[in-house]
Amino acid sequence: MFHAASAQKYVDASTLTIIGRTCPMEGHPYYRVDTTRYRFDNATIRHYCGYPAGVAVLFTTDSRRIEARWTTAPRSYGWNMTPVLQRGMDLYVRENGVWTMAGAARPGLQDRHASTIVEHMDGQPKECMLYLPAWSELLTLEIGVDEGASVTPLESPYKHRVIVFGSSVTHGASASRPGMTYPARMSRMTGIEFVNLGYSGNCMLQPEFARLLAETDADAFLFDAFSNPSPKMIRERLDAFVATLVKAHPDKPLIFMQTHWHTAGNLDQEAAKFHRERINTADGMMRRLAKQYDNVYFLDGEWFFGRDAEGTIDCDHGSDLGYDRMISERLPRIRKILRLSLIHISEPTRRTPI
């Protein structure tokens, strides 16, 4: 059921600034990738192109309250993710240069949603960033404000961008809300736009993805590329995948991250055998490729969610705690590589990771 909200004026969010898209699609403002240009045979991948994981709307308003009403394509809720992550949104406001969470847009049980995000503000202009649903196709989005308030596009604060290609870990499972995925958090922490190109369960070093990434302009590329493919797939596809990207981006950092240890393998012997073979296969091949190509880097280490299972929601996908651990372990190493490319990185303040 669609619940009426109390805001007196609504603005079509597609008329505001939209960031986080790899290849925008005409007529579908919230798609991450244009599916008419990149035609994937896999229907799930095509659907995921339309999921706005990591996409955000930027605007400035002096309204005392901010609301939203939006529609999503029909889809069942996943059991290991929050409704807010899947169909909801979260709003950040920039104060004194720091992005601070202001509220969340609560989704309904059906496909039409309306929610008050924040109210009783002081009426002074606020710079806002609204993260969109990570696990649903967003069909329409309107932002509600007071009748006499202004809503204007806000210029992107990011001057550099890094494409992050990966699995469900990159897509966002199972952060508590869209703004808590690790690419979104690292963007706020560094002042660099980490663009989310996560494809849950379907990041398997396919040639189609190599073509998409080869034709995408960015300052650097970060890969969570080993969580989905089998050891056999890695052996068969990795060399060609890397060669395609090196040829297309010979001067851009190509940073590959080791996959995480799946803690189900702590007790499940079959799982342990499979995951250990995959980790060892990726490790051996990436060390060779990092020596072969000057712009290829490998971040080893599979324990970034922690050696316990407390950093996951299901022994596989990260929780907010797990992603906090991951960022603490990975980001200093990523910063070092990006600085070698003379990319300016902001130093985080105490509140930025929130």
List PLM regions with ranges.
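Short, amphipathic alpha-helical "lid/cap" segments that border enzyme active or binding sites
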Residues: 235, 320-331
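A short helix->loop->beta-strand "cap" motif at the edges of active sites that frequently abuts
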Residues: 249-253
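Glycan-recognition and processing domains
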Residues: 7-50
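Oxyanion-hole/transition-state-stabilizing segment in secreted/luminal serine hydrolases
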Residues: 186, 203-248, 259-266
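Substrate-gating cap/lid alpha-helix
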Residues: 262-299, 325
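Extended, charged alpha/beta regions that create polyanion-binding interfaces
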Residues: 47-154
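Serine-esterase "nucleophile elbow" of acetyl-processing enzymes
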Residues: 5-6, 60, 103, 120-203, ...
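Single conserved hydrophobic/aromatic residue that forms the stacking wall/gate
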Residues: 343-354
